[in-house]
Structure formats: structure tokens, C-alpha cells
From Swiss-Prot:
The keyword Cytoplasm applies. Coiled coil: none annotated. Its main location: cytoplasm. It comes from the Bacteria. It comes from Nitratidesulfovibrio vulgaris (strain DP4). This is Histidine--tRNA ligase. Pfam families: HGTP_anticodon (PF03129), tRNA-synt_His (PF13393). One of its GO terms (cellular component) is cytoplasm. Its EC number is 6.1.1.21. InterPro entries: aa-tRNA-synth_II (IPR006195), aa-tRNA-synth_II/BPL/LPL (IPR045864), Anticodon-bd (IPR004154), Anticodon-bd_dom_sf (IPR036621), His-tRNA-ligase (IPR015807), HisRS-like_core (IPR041715), HisRS/HisZ (IPR004516), HisRS_anticodon (IPR033656). GO terms for biological process: histidyl-tRNA aminoacylation. CDD domains: HisRS-like_core, HisRS_anticodon. Belongs to the class-II aminoacyl-tRNA synthetase family.
Length: 417
């Protein structure tokens, strides 16, 4: 019978990789909690229309990357390619806007996109997302960026660059779109890549986001969106920058930063690193006023960001896994019940450890204890079983002593195990 293997672009995460993800989520909860965020869990499956209406039908995500299929009643469903749309749907459906003027929500979990798998980018990937719904003020944008940078710092990441731009609003962006379209019509379109030629007709702003060197060279002199911001958008953006300056947060004004999803407006930002190759973006987000009403909800403004967990994991400094406090080495099959009960007593007092069940020589039992990484090995054989004792061996110094089984927990705790 043939062996069943995982799907291309999907990964199994064992320690230490899974430990890194757990640590990342733990730091996220600690940092976001200080800013008043609460956790929301949304379904992996959503109706396809949700993403078509939010992300945009002309985006690469909707056109080429979504895992979409009909269910048994021929309803089109999609495995979420990003989290914000699902959060907006949950926000509208729950009527949360009637319960509180501001909602601060964070989510984490797997997303799915049919892309070419590469370093830091899988077809199933994981994100941490934060959304602030309610405030229209630029202070919400700035606070979110400050929180993101604090989160990345507390993960121990260095060598990051915050890039920021303003995409304007529904009043001024059409003027920029026309100016950009006129510019693109004046250059040699045949020299652009196939995707950019398509984007010229459907979403000209996305041409600026192209990573193909030839396209970037051809559009180097394109008009910038900042030059076309209306006074209100410019005032909003200046306020965001002023707050970042006051906190001495370095940033780069990147007038080509447009992001890949259609719902963004005004402030948009991205955190990049040159240490993980071509997939240098580790986090990004922006303001999306109008998205909630576009999905059938009230006219509530919002701003948010997403962090790619696989990409963050590539940069995180290694953390030594906590050592187990004990390992019970069973030398006599008759002592297995007592070994299990001893381990349970120790765990009830907050100590972590394992039991080496099964028969074997003392040499093989000690080898198993060494592999466990435990600080102390508790040796339990026939003599110890009869006497109600256990041999406690310090796995670092090699020193050992025989004590009563009811004294083991105090002994391990006193030793700082």
C-alpha cells in the first residue's frame, strides 16, 4: 500500500518549530492585551462572495490564489486567504457596533493561498492579525503601528524597516488613478510583464507593487500618490508621522507601497527585513474605511495589520526549550504503577516530567533519561518499590541520593528543578 504524504505547500510543525509559534502567540497575547485587544476566533471556511467583495475581484488573490470549491448544496466556499474579511463579517453579524464604540480584536491561525511554495511562504501559512474598528482619527493608525513595532521588538527581532505611505481616499484617489493611467499609457506597455499589462486595465495602482525589475525601472518616474493626496488625507498622514517621530520610531516614506488588497485607503504600512531573502515583508496593514459598509454593515472605519508567522519564525532568535523537571526510570516492571502515580503526584505540584515505561537495562533506562533532557532522574526498581524510596540522580552533576517517595517533590523544588 502506498504511503500517504502531506500536500505540497503544507507543513507539519514539530518542536522546535511549533515551540516558536507557541512563543509568538504568547508574546502577542501579552502585548496586545496591554493595548486593550481581545481575541476573536473565526471560521477557516467562508462564503466566497465575502472575499470577492472585500479583497477585490481583480486582485491576484481572488483571481489566482484562493482555494474555492462548491459544497454538497453547490454553494461556493473558500478557505480563508486572509483574516480581515472574516473579522468584518463576524463584527457585522454579531452587531458588535451596537455594543461598544470601539472594538479592538486580534486573531491568529492558518490561511490558505495557492502560490508557489518558497522560503517563508507556504500554501497553508499562519498569521497574527489585529483590527481596530471605530476610530477615524490618525491616532488609531499611529497606536497600531507602535503596538506592532513593540510586538516585533519583544519577539527579539532586529534589522527591521518600517515603510509607510498614504493611499488617499475615495475623493482624491480617482484623480491619482487617472494620472497614473495616463503615465502608464505613455510608456512601452509591451515591456511590462503580463500581470502588469492586465493590472493597467483593472487596477493600475498594483503596477507599482510589481517586483519584476524591468517593470520597476519602467515605472520609476510614475507620479506618486502622496503628491495627489487631498488636504484632509495629507493632514491625517502628517499626524500619524508626527506621533511616530515623537516616539523616535524610524520609518521610510515609500510612495510605491500600495499593498495587495483593494480595501486599503489612507495610511498603509509594511515592515520588511533583508534577512529572509526575497520574501522580505514580515508584517503589513493599513486603514480600510468603507470596508464594513461595503460588506453590508454600518459605516464604521477601521485599521489593522497582519504578521506572517512563518516569516517571523525565520528571524526569531533561538530560545532554549524549558527542561523537564524529572524523568522516572523504571527498572522493574512491578514498579510501573508506582512510577506512574509518583509522576502524577509531582505534576499535581507543578513539576513537569515523563515516565520511561517498559523493561530494559539500567544503562538503557539512563540513556532514555538523558534524551529526555530532564534535570533529575528518579530511579525506581524492585528494592525502592519495597522500601517506599526512590533514587534521585542530578543529571548535570551525576550526584545521587536515596530518599522517601513522599519527599521527592520538596527535593526537586528545593533544588530549583
Amino acid at each position: 500500500m502506498s504511503k500517504i504524504t502531506k500536500i505540497k505547500g503544507f507543513a507539519d510543525l514539530f518542536p522546535p518549530e511549533s515551540d516558536v509559534f507557541t512563543r509568538m502567540e504568547s508574546v502577542a497575547r501579552q502585548v496586545f492585551g496591554r493595548y486593550g485587544f481581545v481575541e476573536l476566533r473565526t471560521p477557516i471556511l467562508e462564503r466566497t462572495d465575502l472575499f470577492c467583495r472585500s479583497i477585490g475581484t481583480e486582485t491576484d488573490v481572488v483571481q489566482k490564489e484562493m482555494y474555492t470549491f462548491p459544497d454538497r448544496k453547490d454553494r461556493s466556499l473558500t478557505m480563508r486567504p486572509e483574516a480581515t474579511a472574516g473579522v468584518m463579517r463576524a463584527y457585522i453579524e454579531s452587531g458588535r457596533h451596537t455594543q461598544e464604540p470601539v472594538s479592538k480584536l486580534f486573531t491568529s491561525g492558518p490561511m490558505f493561498r495557492y502560490e508557489r511554495p518558497q522560503k517563508g511562504r507556504m500554501r497553508q501559512f499562519h498569521q497574527i492579525n489585529c483590527e481596530v474598528l471605530g476610530p477615524v482619527e490618525p491616532h488609531a493608525d499611529a497606536e497600531l503601528v507602535l503596538m506592532l513595532m513593540r510586538f516585533l521588538t519583544e519577539l527579539g527581532l532586529t534589522g527591521l524597516s518600517l515603510q509607510i505611505n498614504s493611499l488617499g481616499c475615495k475623493e482624491c484617489r480617482p484623480l491619482y488613478r487617472k494620472a497614473l493611467s495616463d503615465f502608464l499609457a505613455s510608456i512601452d506597455n509591451a515591456a511590462l510583464c503580463e500581470d502588469c499589462r492586465r493590472r493597467m486595465e483593472t487596477n493600475p495602482l498594483r503596477v507599482l507593487d510589481c517586483k519584476v525589475p524591468g517593470c520597476r525601472e519602467l515605472t520609476a518616474n510614475a507620479p506618486t500618490i502622496l503628491e495627489h493626496n487631498c488636504p484632509e488625507c495629507r493632514t491625517h498622514f502628517d499626524a500619524v508621522l508626527r506621533i511616530l517621530d515623537s516616539r523616535n520610531v524610524p520609518y521610510v516614506l515609500n510612495d510605491r507601497l500600495v499593498r495587495g488588497l483593494d480595501y486599503y485607503n489612507r495610511t498603509t504600512f509594511e515592515v520588511v527585513s533583508d534577512s529572509i531573502g526575497s520574501q522580505g515583508s514580515v508584517a503589513g496593514g493599513g486603514r480600510y474605511d468603507g470596508l464594513i459598509s461595503q460588506l453590508g454593515g454600518p459605516d464604521v472605519p477601521g485599521v489593522g495589520f497582519a504578521c506572517g508567522m512563518e516569516r517571523l519564525a525565520l528571524m526569531m532568535p533561538g530560545a532554549e526549550a524549558p527542561r523537564p523537571h524529572f524523568h522516572v526510570a523504571v527498572l522493574d516492571p512491578a514498579a510501573q504503577d508506582a512510577a506512574l502515580l509518583l509522576a502524577e503526584d509531582l505534576r499535581a505540584q507543578g513539576l513537569a516530567g515523563s515516565v520511561g515505561f517498559g523493561a530494559g537495562s539500567i544503562k538503557s533506562r539512563m540513556r532514555l533519561a538523558g534524551k529526555s533532557g530532564a534535570r533529575a532522574c528518579l530511579i525506581l526498581g524492585g528494592d525502592e518499590l519495597a522500601a517506599g524510596t526512590v533514587v534521585v540522580k542530578d543529571m548535570d552533576s551525576g550526584e545521587q541520593e536515596t530518599i522517601g517517595r513522599d519527599a521527592v517533590a520538596a527535593r526537586l523544588l528545593a533544588a530549583g528543578a
